[in-house]
Amino acid sequence: MSSKLVLVLNCGSSSLKFAIIDAVNGEEYLSGLAECFHLPEARIKWKMDGNKQEAALGAGAAHSEALNFIVNTILAQKPELSAQLTAIGHRIVHGGEKYTSSVVIDESVIQGIKDAASFAPLHNPAHLIGIEEALKSFPQLKDKNVAVFDTAFHQTMPEESYLYALPYNLYKEHGIRRYGAHGTSHFYVTQEAAKMLNKPVEELNIITCHLGNGGSVSAIRNGKCVDTSMGLTPLEGLVMGTRSGDIDPAIIFHLHDTLGMSVDAINKLLTKESGLLGLTEVTSDCRYVEDNYATKEDAKRAMDVYCHRLAKYIGAYTALMDGRLDAVVFTGGIGENAAMVRELSLGKLGVLGFEVDHERNLAARFGKSGFINKEGTRPAVVIPTNEELVIAQDASRLTA
């Protein structure tokens, strides 16, 4: 077994994803999910040595109970795993402007994560709980905890990409600007695309589409992010599972003034009741939309709006490529599996030289990477993301 084992933690407001990964070869020794925190059905599921197990955490359990269970129950089954841990990597959704790369966690970093919490009110406070609990559970690794920021990869954006056309003082005094998200995923697939296209990363011009329950598109020029669709928060941009993405901001005033909705109700509407769920009025699941596209009006409506928005972003970002677009990359749960989304979206972009090969497109699903374009047309690639590996590698590198 390698001596570069890293515990990767991804704390959400009501869940905790965890894995132990070899940062050298990417092998996963443990993976799992604790979920339904603060509810009677709080539970934990994990896979170790190919065996899947699950257990109840007890009513109302949360991050502390989950980490206790990982340390005292799961890792107790295999003490050599615990003994070989060299670092802990924490996924942090928002690092504000301060963090342009991953950092070893100390008091100032904890304060920085707190300072950015207003931009990620559901996520950052949960990350801080995860850090606090990890420091308690693994005292021997107290100076080996690393924060990996979802916003860091986008910090290379130029001013014209990240500024909103609002009074400049709002940016200077309050940090209101575009930050983006999914940066770790966009970074990973950029590195992988360079290998598949046989080009040095620093010469790579691509558009990366991370499509999951949340979704974002990034423009990568010479290997660096120059624009991305998510904004101050992950609400801007594409149509998502339950998020609206781009809307006319005046809709908010209309909902408030004319329909009498409260600010909290509007926030809930835009973040939890819109997107595919809002358009279908049934589900946020893209599989339903794909499976029922030909037979159900709600599914067709949702898919058409989704792909229209995605194609618009890809088209717009070609303008930032300095005249050379090497490929479009699809990743994330929808990007990797929804062949119809890829085909319909790229079908709108024939003017840019995209032509999807139907068979190749169907083959590149369920964890398989590959080119999905017809021979001789502009490359379109599917690359399964691996954010956990990036987090493990950064944690290992910074604590070596």
From Swiss-Prot:
Mg(2+) binds at residues 10, 387. Its EC number is 2.7.2.1. It catalyses: acetate + ATP = acetyl phosphate + ADP. The keyword Nucleotide-binding applies. It comes from Escherichia coli (strain K12). It is found in: Cytoplasm. Homodimer. Substrate binds at residue 91. The keyword Transferase applies. The record marks 182, 243 as: Transition state stabilizer. GO terms for cellular component: cytosol; membrane. This is Acetate kinase.
